[in-house]
Amino acid sequence: MRQIFNRVKWSGRRAYFWFISRGSPGGEEVLSTDDVVEVGANGVVVSVGGRERYIPYHRIVEIRLESGEVLLSRRGGREPSGGL
């Protein structure tokens, strides 16, 4: 997964990723790779609204390019619950 984030980052393309978030409606949130400030060995650090958060890779369920191409899906056929 780290390789996917690095490829997107260095290509200059934008992608969106859905992750499990217990406090959110539907149990998921979606963010843009534009929000990623660090790609680590076990997760990413994002900055949203001036606040940084760590999101471990095991919570990420889908990564999709802005064009709609799915780079990673661990959903088993379910559609994302958070909209774009």
Curated annotation (Swiss-Prot):
High-level lineage: Archaea, Thermoproteota, Thermoprotei, Thermoproteales, Thermoproteaceae
UniProt name for this protein: UPF0248 protein Pisl_1919
Source organism of the structure: Pyrobaculum islandicum (strain DSM 4184 / JCM 9189 / GEO3)
Family classification: Belongs to the UPF0248 family.
